[in-house]
């Protein structure tokens, strides 16, 4: 792996640190490398949760590397598997990802965070999609995912004017899960990761599958879809060893031992 990415495995938790001074900006080469990391995470049966963060205390990521852009890298360049930053276009990832946002998350950096399942941010974090002020658009998920979270008036202001949103406002709107001090950020993200590890992996996979396939459906239609047999993970949960282990462990007053099958 390159000097731009630092990987740490803590049991079944993978920590990914983006380290590209001065702003953890992402060029196509780095994006390719991040895509390989996330795909390897997806396919590694020993890994359950990933945490993505930025080096330092100022920038999570400033998004697309404008220096690379000035040198000829196009906005529609091939950013590799998983799309920009390796995560924004992985639509079949059945394991949870936590974005530990340690500072500014601008442009593609915000889009990377939005592609995660959870956002834990430091109290100095700030979020923005300033692409329109640069003559481009936030098309790595920002203009698609943000409207699912925020009211149209807030989305319009953020994407059309580049308005920044601070950590506390992001918490009020439900953009982030938690706001903690910079010193507590990684410990808090790891605590959340461990809570996810404590849940059954097949159940987590089924939940993610249900979310992504039914979120736009009316409830009645979604019920029919889930029970039609077309999903992969949901039926696997119902007939799994873990579905037996969970109630048994509860009855025996012990922690469950998940097998993922």
Swiss-Prot record:
Pfam families: ECH_1. InterPro entries: Carnitinyl_CoA_dehydratase, ClpP/crotonase-like_dom_sf, Enoyl-CoA_hyd/isom_CS, Enoyl-CoA_hydra/iso, Enoyl-CoA_hydra_C. The active site is at residues 111, 131. Keywords: Lyase. One of its GO terms (molecular function) is hydro-lyase activity. Pathway: Amine and polyamine metabolism; carnitine metabolism. GO terms for biological process: carnitine metabolic process; fatty acid beta-oxidation. Its EC number is 4.2.1.149. It catalyses: (R)-carnitinyl-CoA = crotonobetainyl-CoA + H2O. Catalyzes the reversible dehydration of L-carnitinyl-CoA to crotonobetainyl-CoA. Belongs to the enoyl-CoA hydratase/isomerase family. This is Carnitinyl-CoA dehydratase. It comes from Escherichia coli (strain SMS-3-5 / SECEC).
